[in-house]
């Protein structure tokens, strides 16, 4: 019983605004060094302006980058944009230990965001043909994962109160003309700080974790 309780605990790390590459490096190091007894973790972070190109990324989806850097990432998916006012949540879960599949984890993350948005009175949905979460046919949350040694890393990026213009410089997630939306378009005045605790709570509820911050 003690063993089970230990592994249903998840640790939360509040990282503020941090450059993409050091966080990516730390995430890789955490995943490489973890073993079967390592507790799972959630990392909440915002990144300065950056485009990240996923494993499936193609150069033709980079349209007019301007002065925003492009960084290659080993997450799934194509190109996306990160910037202040967007909540990124990285999920380091031992899915083998948790006995969940990758598709189950993706669905749990999408449902987490859908329920978080519902908390603020916004109706959102997932699409079977394009991972992520959508509101009125516009994308509000991007999702990209990597699995290594039976453990997940990378995660989601939820648009809350940010400058959406850089999304026009790319084909978001490889879809030309994909319309992007943010929560503040629907709930004026909403902040990242208001959304964070709800997002974490809904994620823990979805997968049965007890939070240890």
UniProtKB/Swiss-Prot annotation:
One GO cellular component term noted in the UniProt record for this chain: cytoplasm
Pathway annotation: Protein modification; protein lipoylation via endogenous pathway; protein N(6)-(lipoyl)lysine from octanoyl-[acyl-carrier-protein]: step 1/2
Q: Give the EC number(s) under which this enzyme is classified.
A: 2.3.1.181
Q: Where is this site: Lowers pKa of active site Cys?
A: 139
Q: Where does substrate bind?
A: 75-82, 142-144, 155-157
Q: Where does the UniProt annotation locate this protein?
A: Cytoplasm
> Which family does the UniProt entry place this protein in?
Belongs to the LipB family.
Function field: Catalyzes the transfer of endogenously produced octanoic acid from octanoyl-acyl-carrier-protein onto the lipoyl domains of lipoate-dependent enzymes. Lipoyl-ACP can also act as a substrate although octanoyl-ACP is likely to be the physiological substrate.
Remaining remarks: In the reaction, the free carboxyl group of octanoic acid is attached via an amide linkage to the epsilon-amino group of a specific lysine residue of lipoyl domains of lipoate-dependent enzymes.
Q: What is this protein called?
A: Octanoyltransferase
Source organism of the structure: Photorhabdus laumondii subsp. laumondii (strain DSM 15139 / CIP 105565 / TT01) (Photorhabdus luminescens subsp. laumondii)
Q: What is the lineage of its organism?
A: Bacteria, Pseudomonadati, Pseudomonadota, Gammaproteobacteria, Enterobacterales
